[in-house]
C-alpha cells in the first residue's frame, strides 16, 4: 500500500518540476495550439498556447511508475499509456510542426490504436492469466462473487479493442476545456486504485496512483487560464493507461460507469452527427457536451468543476458496484 502513495507523490513532484522546464521550450519551439473558428468565441484568445504538454505528466507518471512498480501488470498499464501517448505525439507533431491541420490520417491513428488494444488483450489473457470473462457490476448484490460472463477469445478480443478505442478517443474528446480532462482523469484513476486492489493487482493500483499524481501536477499548469495544453499526446495516453487498468482488473464495465463523463462526451458527438445527418437538426448547441454548456452561458470553470463533481458521483456509483464481487 505504501508504494501506491509513493508512486503518487513521486509522479506529482516530477510533474511539478518538469512543467516550468518544458513549457518555455514548447513556447520557444512555437508548438502552439490552433483554435477552431467555429467554437466558442472566447476560446480564440487561447490560440498559440503551447500544446503537447502531455509529455510533462507522462514524465512524472513514468518516474513514479517505473521506479516503484515491479509487477508485469503494472508495467503493461504504463506501457499502454506511453504507447497511446506516442500515437498522440505523432498526431500533435504533424499538426503543430508539419502544419498538416488534421494530423495523422484517421486510418493511421485507428490502426495504431487497434494494434495496441489487441496486444493488450492477448497479453492479459495468455500472459497474465486474466481469462476471457467480464464481470457484471452490481451482480454481487445478487450472489457473492458476482456474475461473470465468459466471452471466449475472439469475442473478448473484439470487445477489448472496441472498448479501448472508444474510451481512449472519448478521453480525447473530453480534453476541450482548461483542466477538464486532467481533473476528470485524476479522479477516475484514483477510483481505479481500490478496484485494482480488490482484484489483487497492486502493480496496477500503483500505476493508477502515478497517473493520478501526474494529472494533479499537470493541473497546476492546465487549470484556467491554462499555460499549456496536454494535446493528443496527453489525452490518448490517459485513455490508454486507464483502459489498460480496466482490462487487466476485469473492471471494463465498472470503468464505463466510473468514466461516465467520457461516455457522455463521446455519445454527445455521436448523437449530434447522426441527428444532423438524418434530420438536418442539432440536438446540442455544440458537441462535445462541455461546449453545449459553454454556449448556454456557463463559464469555463463552472463547466469543469461541475464535470469534476459528476465524476465523483460516477466514481462512487462504480465503486458501489464492487460490492461482494471479491
UniProtKB/Swiss-Prot annotation:
EC number: 2.7.8.13
Alphabetic keyword roster: Cell cycle, Cell division, Cell membrane, Cell shape, Cell wall biogenesis/degradation, Magnesium, Membrane, Metal-binding, Peptidoglycan synthesis, Transferase, Transmembrane, Transmembrane helix
PROSITE patterns: MRAY_1, MRAY_2
Topology relative to the membrane: Multi-pass membrane protein
Record-level GO BP terms: cell division; cell wall organization; peptidoglycan biosynthetic process; regulation of cell shape
Pfam families tied to this protein: Glycos_transf_4, MraY_sig1
Principal subcellular localisation of the protein: membrane
Origin: domain of life: Bacteria
Record has Aminoacyl-tRNA synthetase as a keyword: no
Molecular function as annotated in GO: metal ion binding; phospho-N-acetylmuramoyl-pentapeptide-transferase activity; UDP-N-acetylmuramoyl-L-alanyl-D-glutamyl-meso-2,6-diaminopimelyl-D-alanyl-D-alanine:undecaprenyl-phosphate transferase activity
Ranges that cross the membrane: 4-24, 49-69, 74-94, 109-129, 151-171, 179-199, 203-223, 228-248, 254-274, 303-323
Cofactor: Mg(2+)
GO cellular component, one term: plasma membrane
Top EC category: transferase
Recorded catalytic activity of this chain's protein: UDP-N-acetyl-alpha-D-muramoyl-L-alanyl-gamma-D-glutamyl-meso-2,6-diaminopimeloyl-D-alanyl-D-alanine + di-trans,octa-cis-undecaprenyl phosphate = di-trans,octa-cis-undecaprenyl diphospho-N-acetyl-alpha-D-muramoyl-L-alanyl-D-glutamyl-meso-2,6-diaminopimeloyl-D-alanyl-D-alanine + UMP
Pathway terms, separated by semicolons: Cell wall biogenesis; peptidoglycan biosynthesis
Compartment(s) of residence: Cell membrane
Keyword Ligase: no
Family, similarity comment: Belongs to the glycosyltransferase 4 family. MraY subfamily.
Function: Catalyzes the initial step of the lipid cycle reactions in the biosynthesis of the cell wall peptidoglycan: transfers peptidoglycan precursor phospho-MurNAc-pentapeptide from UDP-MurNAc-pentapeptide onto the lipid carrier undecaprenyl phosphate, yielding undecaprenyl-pyrophosphoryl-MurNAc-pentapeptide, known as lipid I.
Descriptive protein name: Phospho-N-acetylmuramoyl-pentapeptide-transferase
Gene that encodes it: mraY
Amino acid at each position: 500500500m505504501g508504494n501506491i502513495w509513493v508512486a503518487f507523490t513521486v509522479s506529482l513532484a516530477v510533474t511539478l518540476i518538469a512543467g516550468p522546464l518544458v513549457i518555455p521550450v514548447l513556447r520557444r519551439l512555437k508548438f502552439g495550439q490552433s483554435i477552431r473558428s467555429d467554437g466558442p468565441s472566447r476560446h480564440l484568445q487561447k490560440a498559440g498556447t503551447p500544446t503537447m504538454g502531455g509529455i510533462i505528466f507522462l514524465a512524472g507518471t513514468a518516474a513514479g511508475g517505473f521506479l516503484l512498480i515491479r509487477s508485469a501488470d503494472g508495467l503493461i498499464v504504463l506501457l499502454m499509456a506511453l504507447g497511446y501517448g506516442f500515437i498522440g505525439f505523432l498526431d500533435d507533431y504533424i499538426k503543430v510542426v508539419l502544419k498538416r491541420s488534421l494530423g495523422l490520417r484517421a486510418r493511421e491513428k485507428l490502426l495504431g490504436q487497434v494494434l495496441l488494444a489487441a496486444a493488450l488483450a492477448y497479453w492479459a489473457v495468455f500472459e497474465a492469466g486474466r481469462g476471457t470473462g467480464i464481470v457484471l457490476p452490481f451482480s454481487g448484490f445478487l450472489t457473492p462473487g458476482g456474475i461473470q460472463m465468459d466471452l471466449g477469445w475472439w469475442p473478448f478480443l473484439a470487445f477489448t479493442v472496441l472498448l479501448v478505442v472508444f474510451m481512449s478517443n472519448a478521453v480525447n474528446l473530453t480534453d476541450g476545456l482548461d483542466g477538464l480532462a486532467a481533473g476528470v482523469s485524476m479522479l477516475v484513476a484514483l477510483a481505479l486504485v481500490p478496484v485494482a486492489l480488490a482484484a489483487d493487482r497492486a502493480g496496477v493500483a500503483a500505476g493508477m496512483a502515478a497517473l493520478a499524481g501526474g494529472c494533479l501536477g499537470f493541473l497546476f499548469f492546465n487549470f484556467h487560464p491554462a499555460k499549456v495544453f496536454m494535446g493528443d499526446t496527453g489525452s490518448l495516453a490517459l485513455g490508454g493507461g486507464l483502459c489498460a487498468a480496466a482490462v487487466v482488473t476485469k473492471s471494463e464495465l465498472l470503468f464505463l460507469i466510473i468514466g461516465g463523463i467520457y461516455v457522455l462526451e463521446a455519445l454527445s458527438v455521436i448523437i449530434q452527427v447522426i441527428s444532423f445527418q438524418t434530420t438536418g437538426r442539432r440536438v446540442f448547441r455544440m458537441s462535445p457536451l462541455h461546449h453545449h454548456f459553454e454556449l448556454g452561458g456557463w463559464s469555463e470553470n463552472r463547466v469543469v468543476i461541475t464535470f469534476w463533481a459528476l465524476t465523483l458521483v460516477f466514481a462512487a456509483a462504480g465503486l458501489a458496484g464492487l460490492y461482494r464481487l471479491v
